[in-house]
Design a protein with these regions (language model features):
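Polytopic transmembrane helical bundles with strong interfacial aromatic enrichment
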Residues: 1-272
């Protein structure tokens, strides 16, 4: 592959990746905001069985959205939100291979004298291993406590960041953490949120009362995704600021601190 073709491929995939991410994160925060509005309206109208509506104005019209407790249309008429997450992850993985796994950007011999193959193996192991650890923790009693789970997650991110900063180049280590969080977010959508939603739709279509825990499980993973999205976006743009981020003497500490700041920002947005 010539350098010119590689550069255009890099640019095209990056463009696609950013736009897909905008669509995914945008809809995630939109529904997060909607849920917050519905919760406030339900508290005000305690005892009223009429589904509350959120009124909005956008472009050239007014919109009224109501949250339903039953399925009022055929299952095939329900709009799913899934491809945005998959397209974001797939394009991100292509970028990871283009920029790091198939180039010299992955390894820094001043950091660790390892082979390219070893670096790739480390990177892929982190992506899979982090999901398995996160998912196990989220399904355990630890996942029922927001403070305990947040503490565990921060320790996990800090430990993996520290390890990667001593094995890969600083830039690759940062992007690997971003890819790790993005992989967890996508796996949440496809392996936890969508299966719960399928069961909810199938049960509702059959005229039965669906298990409320299904919705709670999907909502919890969606909540986790809103907290991971902000640090991921930061990591995406960190490439442009090497002195302040991955090239800094305190690169690992800066990354962990900015994950915390990102979580704080996400909490503010969620409560707006």
């Amino acid at each position: 592959m010539t350098s010119s073709i590689r550069e255009w491929l890099n640019l095209s995939v990056r463009w696609f990746h950013v736009f897909a991410a905008i669509m995914w994160v945008g809809q995630t925060y939109y529904f997060t905001w909607l849920d917050g509005q519905f919760n406030r309206l339900e508290k005000k109208a305690a005892g009223d069985e009429t589904p509350p509506q959120v009124w909005m104005v956008h472009s050239g019209g007014f919109y009224a959205v109501a949250k339903q407790k039953s399925l009022g249309v055929l299952p095939e008429q329900v709009r799913w939100f899934r491809w945005e997450a998959l397209m974001t992850w797939l394009s991100g993985m292509v970028l990871l291979f283009l920029v790091y796994y198939s180039s010299s950007g992955l390894i820094d011999t001043d950091v660790a004298n390892i082979s390219q193959a070893a670096g790739i193996a480390i990177g892929l192991t982190v992506l899979l291993g982090a999901w398995l650890i996160y998912d196990s923790a989220a399904r355990s009693p630890l996942g029922k406590s927001e403070a305990a789970f947040a503490t565990f997650s921060l320790i996990m991110i800090a430990a993996i960041s520290f390890g990667l900063m001593h094995l890969l180049s600083g830039r690759a280590a940062y992007m690997e953490i971003g890819a790790m969080l993005g992989t967890i977010m996508t796996a949440n959508v496809w392996f936890r949120i969508l299966p719960s939603q399928r069961k909810m739709i199938a049960t509702a279509a059959a005229g039965a009362q669906f298990d409320a825990s299904l919705g709670a499980q999907a909502k919890l993973r969606s909540k986790h995704n809103t907290f991971m999205a902000v640090p991921v976006v930061f990591i995406m743009i960190s490439n442009h600021f090497p002195v302040a981020t991955y090239g800094n003497t305190y690169a690992c500490e800066i990354l962990v601190a900015l994950v915390l700041i990102g979580w704080g920002a996400a909490k503010i947005i969620r409560e707006a």
